């Protein structure tokens, strides 16, 4: 009998997907990694601890990778692997913030390439590595979930527990008898019970809610690193991009056209020529304007620049540098806009347009050199600082970006290609910043005798590894104008005697802190600094004893 209910199609029964298979090594290394994370990082800083944990993660992941996996043939995999190990070593050696950032970012990017070996974009690899944390945590939850046949297991344990009850009671009776009859056996067992009690007391003292949550954090992060569960979305999105701009007609019904578009277009045949004329006129005008600006900068800044006593060099560098960098970025954006699609194939005038755009790019490179010279003069006037080093890093990226714009102009490179190349360059700059002991170099540069005005508060606020350099140059503070910045952002004068007292206090605090540190929080640079002050203290004691002996 046909009824309405029978005519409705039944909803197919959905079967839950089986959990992602894990190897025995991964299951064993998960608790090991969580315990290692807790030992290395609980109430410790990221120093030698970060190097050891990174080596553990890299070794564990590589140990579970098949010999014929596609990831071994990926150049991005090897690049980020070397970057991860290099930055991790620099964390243990120098311990700078740039090294820590580079190590964590490199490890996540490397795990992203492990997940999807065919990825090329560094940003997509970073997002893939971060997203892998979510399915990994879900898979870890499946491991910790109680089995379905828990009831039968409990019954089985209860059965065997009752069988062992009588032997355990008998063992306890004989233990009491032997302890009464044999004093040495009694002393040995008392010592064992005391050790067990001390171990349990230490365990319960350290067990706290924050510590437990920190251990769970280590368990989650270790699972996110060790459980590489494939995530294909970003790799599928990247596969749609190409390295070059190809001429493709969308108004064609063909398998070669992924998304044919037959909508009415308002674009008329002469509109492309109008766009070409607009681009040509714009490039001609801005080239002329930029030529005037570059001519002024070359004549004023490049050769024989000597600022007047009343010249505001701070405004000249800070505001001028930011405005010039913004103009370079806008120039790159305009070139990318005009060469995004059809003008690449406009045969009547594409060569003229390319020549004009090339001249503009080269003039922007000249402008970048002018920005670098502004920054150089400011460094020669007031010393090194973090932002002044960062300006040079940004200018390196800018020059590389201008070179990739030339590739787009002459080789019809796509925007995807430019993003890929510039992301690799940004990653290289990050590794470059991670590999430098910049604070020590800044102290050595800023305390040169030619600088009469020194921001000594800025130098005292640097990490502890610069203290030996400050101590070696403390005798050069006399006769200088020392300043420091107060909590309200105002500059206050600092007497040389007060500066030496502040330095002595910093050294005393550093030695006390270094003595309290455990081995996971140590770096080679801080160890060298502590050794320097220890040797200096021993030399002082020897000199005092020698003077005391010479009096008698």
Positions of PLM-derived features:
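Membrane-helix interface motif
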Residues: 176-194, 291-308, 369-377, 442
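Hydrophobic alpha-helical transmembrane segments in integral membrane proteins
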Residues: 430-456
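Transmembrane-helix bundle segments that line or gate the permeation/cavity pathway
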Residues: 40-191, 210-239
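N-terminal signal-anchor module of multipass membrane proteins
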Residues: 1-67
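Membrane-embedded alpha-helical segments of integral membrane proteins
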Residues: 359-409
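Extracytosolic and intramembrane catalytic regions of membrane-associated proteins
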Residues: 460-552
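Juxtamembrane membrane-water interface segments of multi-pass membrane proteins
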Residues: 6-24, 65-74, 121, 142-160, ...
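Short aromatic-rich membrane-water interface segments that cap or initiate transmembrane helices
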Residues: 159, 197-213, 310-327, 384-395, ...
